[in-house]
């Protein structure tokens, strides 16, 4: 056996030589193990990308919060099923945590602080424009204070137009058509009803409800000045248990139709009360196609209740049908039948932006999210960089009994679905913005 020597040292004997060789091997193995563990640790430290949904999960609109949660859970599951999000550090999974705001501003802010402390980089909310406004303000201030812990706000339902106009915020992205866009689509259908001569306006008394009634009056004046507004009323949000007095006033006014942006139980109880008092006019709604409203109206709503959305299950097309059936396979209970294509497009847009940025760092992602263009279920939408307002097609549907080619799917097992009345391309409902975006310096 050849001897191992050290410069300036005496030759080693056989035993010393064996010990030295074993020591060298041990050190090398330890080094390789350390390097491997360090690499794995670095990857582990990246971990999953943290998402936080801040929503009213209790209180009068708890069912709406739970319905949104199912949509986001499904979106996250689909992304993770394909391996997660590709970044410069490899594939990373998404993790969604929910926080109960109880629909209150202070609770929403408390939830935001908890989410940030838990490592959330992306905040999702939508079931209150009032909550959205305070979250936008808080997130902007937080991002200025702590640029190393920035977060982005992705809004799926808060549609007060101001949020992407005079109150626009670089850190906020809205994926639902705002109230004026939705009203534009509804009014294009309403104006064709030449028999309609009087309407009653009713809404929830907060920023969104006020915006809906304000825009309804403006568009009626422009498109159908012959229509009389026989009532214009706001009611407390989420606090009215009995809508019979409101329904009685609507019927007594002689109105032939109601225009409302009401959602959740405030809509379900309203249409139920209207049925009880015998009101036989139409309902032009933003959200009358879900969460109990069709079942509450029953046959009385057939041909009478209209709704506007970015997509409905009975929109024609193989891709649309495939999308809806995939959701129904995941959530097969009638009570769980509440799917919004925009929420899936929102998650796909976020994934696209993270992958293009190469990391989950919110500023880098925001710069890519401004350019997002995604498609699913036969629907395509893109983000407008000027104001962070997503541009997508809209559809108006009218309540009908399930059956035939036009209404193959019902809503929540009610036996009633929505037949497509008119579809609008994205550019047909796009509206100018007054947003003066203040962009971060770096």
Where are these regions (language model features)?
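Extracytoplasmic "Venus flytrap"
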Residues: 52-75, 99-105, 128, 202-211, ...
